[in-house]
């Protein structure tokens, strides 16, 4: 693997709160051009791992972005390459949707016209252009989620080599927007980004991921392509539920059925 294709390297990642071990000696290398999905039951450590990887939680773990430690990066430059959609985004000001999306341009050196063009494009991709003048607090949960996705996409729009982290980006979305969001993740990866997604839906993970990482009680339980990681045995061991995993009738990914 060339260094340029390695977006994140994280060695011996551990985290605890008091005596509770949240993550236990996780080693990861995340590559450009791939969608990597984190799976696992509630409390497995998925969101904590994402927060450590993006430095939302300060730690002394060895995490590198594109081969450089965080303290070797200029903060503004890293912000242009590392976009994070948290599980919950709050905003109390009555900005309209267009203004919220434009907040993603803060680390960028762009003319007003260039920023308007980028935000318009990202709003089109996330299907929120019709909401442009709506006050953000008046939106539904799913609409707010798509607004923040457009903001994150605006933030990282100027670099082909970038990292996009999405923590449960489909949790408030209807079926159509779930698939649109994960198609955008695939599009980003095809353009060279490293995309890391936290999901609960195993079938969405199987359909849209290049790689699936399964956590349980802070430990790595599976790591591989969807066919390698999403198996009936893994699901029973990790989730305690019997399932049947079969091939999609026309597409090459596993489909999980309740047994």
UniProtKB/Swiss-Prot annotation:
On whether Cell inner membrane is a keyword of this UniProt record, the answer is yes
Source organism superkingdom: Bacteria
Gene Ontology terms for molecular function:
ATP binding; ATP hydrolysis activity
> Residues that bind ATP, according to the entry?
40-47
Task: Give a GO cellular-component term.
Answer: plasma membrane
Membrane topology value: Peripheral membrane protein
> Where does it live in the cell?
Cell inner membrane
Write down the EC number.
7.6.2.-
Q: Which UniProt keywords apply?
A: ATP-binding, Cell inner membrane, Cell membrane, Membrane, Nucleotide-binding, Translocase, Transport
User: Mostly located where?
Assistant: membrane
The chain positions of domain ABC transporter read 8-242
Q: Which Pfam families match?
A: ABC_tran
InterPro entries for the chain: AAA+_ATPase (IPR003593), ABC_transporter-like_ATP-bd (IPR003439), P-loop_NTPase (IPR027417)
Q: PROSITE patterns annotated for this entry?
A: ABC_TRANSPORTER_2, HMUV
The entry assigns this protein to a family as follows: Belongs to the ABC transporter superfamily. Heme (hemin) importer (TC 3.A.1.14.5) family.
Q: Which PANTHER family match?
A: HEMIN IMPORT ATP-BINDING PROTEIN HMUV
**Function statement:** Part of the ABC transporter complex HmuTUV involved in hemin import. Responsible for energy coupling to the transport system.
Identify this protein by name: Hemin import ATP-binding protein HmuV
* Source species: Aliivibrio fischeri (strain ATCC 700601 / ES114) (Vibrio fischeri)
State the taxonomy lineage. Bacteria, Pseudomonadati, Pseudomonadota, Gammaproteobacteria, Vibrionales
């Amino acid at each position: 693997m060339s260094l340029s294709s390695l977006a994140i390297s994280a060695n011996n990642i551990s985290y605890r709160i008091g005596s509770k071990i949240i993550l236990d000696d996780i080693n990861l290398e995340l590559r450009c051009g791939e969608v990597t999905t984190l799976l696992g039951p509630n409390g497995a450590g998925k969101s904590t791992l994402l927060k450590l990887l993006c430095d939302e939680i300060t730690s002394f773990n060895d995490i590198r972005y594109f081969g450089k430690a965080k303290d070797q990066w200029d903060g503004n430059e890293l912000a242009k390459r590392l976009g994070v959609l948290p599980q919950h985004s709050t905003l109390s000001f009555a900005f309209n949707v267009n203004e919220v999306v434009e907040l993603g341009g803060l680390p960028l050196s762009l003319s007003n016209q260039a920023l308007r063009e980028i935000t318009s494009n990202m709003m089109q991709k996330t299907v929120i252009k019709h909401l442009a003048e709506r006050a953000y607090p008046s939106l539904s949960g799913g609409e707010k989620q798509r607004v923040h996705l457009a903001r994150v996409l605006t933030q990282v729009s100027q670099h082909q080599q970038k990292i996009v982290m999405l923590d449960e980006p489909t949790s408030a979305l209807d079926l159509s927007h779930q698939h649109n969001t994960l198609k955008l993740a695939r599009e980003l990866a095809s353009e060279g980004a490293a995309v890391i997604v936290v999901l609960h839906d195993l079938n969405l993970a199987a359909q849209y991921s290049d790689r699936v990482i399964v956590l349980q009680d802070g430990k790595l339980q599976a790591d591989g392509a969807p066919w390698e990681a999403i198996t009936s045995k893994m699901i029973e061991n990790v989730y305690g539920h019997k399932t049947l995993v079969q091939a999609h009738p026309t597409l090459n990914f596993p489909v999980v059925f309740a047994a």
